[in-house]
């Protein structure tokens, strides 16, 4: 089987096994998505979701963030790692959004990556979930799943993205990204992957997985191990 065909079958299999896969950050607006993704760096989504209701209520739009000092955000995000740096980035990004984009989150990669606190991965996540462009953002889970499946040996996120993007049509990049995140969190764990509960075990190379752990498992769909997602939109 050609690698492109296998990649397509993997995405199909994961989509069948995990029909509810979606972003787990809570947001209602484009700006809330951007802020939540910035805050999620090196932090679990659940922790971010605990912090953002108060933050979003206090700063309802880009103008509110732009008029604030980074310290004004601290009480709302103090529980998150690197909160001082993230608060500063959010304020600076909001000021640029106000001045350069009329208060609206830009919908192109170059414009997003020009904002403080926004790198390639963050921009890709925002583009995917705004439906504004095709991207395959690579986080820890996406990188691990891509390597375990045997599609890449790369550890650098940009190289993983390049090799995976070459195996899938652009219109499937965002879907594959979200499925790999969901799969990595629920089944393909870093230390003890649940190969028996994997919906695509028959297509997986199990690269780097000890033989004692990499039991064949069922090739058909499996149900996600955790509860349904919170209110983040697909």
Feature locations, PLM:
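Polybasic, lysine-enriched low-complexity intrinsically disordered terminal tails
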Residues: 1, 206, 210-234
